Amino acid sequence: MKTFILDFLSKALDDFLHKNAPIAESIKKRIEQSERERKELSGIRKIANERAKKANLHNKKLRDCRVHLNAEIPAKNKEEFQIKKLASTIFITEGDSASGSITKSRDVDSQAVFSLRGKPLNSFGLTKKVVYENEEFNLLQHALNIEDGLDGLRYNNIVIATDADVDGMHIRLLIMTFFLQFFPDIVRNGHVYILETPLFRVRNKKETIYCYSEAEKQKAIAKLGGKPEITRFKGLGEISPDEFGKFIGEDIKKDPVLISKDAPIQKLLEYYMGTNTPARQKFIIENLVVEKDDAIEMEPEEVLV
């Protein structure tokens, strides 16, 4: 039976490819490209993995947690351990300043921190070879344990934690491009999130209100009355560890990065992260937003940190 089915499929496929030469040529090119990539990877994978293993012994970029998604459930306290597995989280931050506050305020049982060094590489259009050649990408894939697929994923929640400014938004896009380019299923399966942190702190001697938008700030000012102290958080590193603990605890606000199963990922990446095109230039011009300089526009009672 097996031989019959294989012969039947082989003949049917052969007939189809002969009748559809463009499709056959496209498949041929894809096979040849995959073979070239495989040969390139084989030469650097061993070296990169050896470097990563050495780094993992004392990876300065990773502050790991105790419980991971891929951990075996012990005989005792099964339910409690399962809850911690599902809560396992890794925060990907920009720089040591931001990671410092998170590291000091995190739950060491289920929250890990991975610190990037500034803006990562734009990986759109690159082959997977760059994942092994680029030190940060290689260390990140080993921290997540996704080199061979998602079965060994170590964290259920991958949270991108960047400043809420233009540079921070750019870093978010670069990290998401990395995942969508090389590990799209990690996004499709709902593991990737964006951390929301407050933009303002409005307080008087009796009450403190954290605000995530200008509208929330105005409501807080109206509620407290008088002249409350208003603090504008310019970056994650400027939020104290004591305060940060409130934003990554039970009341954490994180937006899921959602993408449908049939979304044209490559077309989206090409449009937003590829080379400049007239269409993208037009989109940028039509959606350009000029931000006010808070340092200049600051009200007398506001404090900038």
Where would I find each of the regions flagged by the language model?
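Conserved phosphate-chemistry cores used by DNA topoisomerases
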Residues: M1-V305
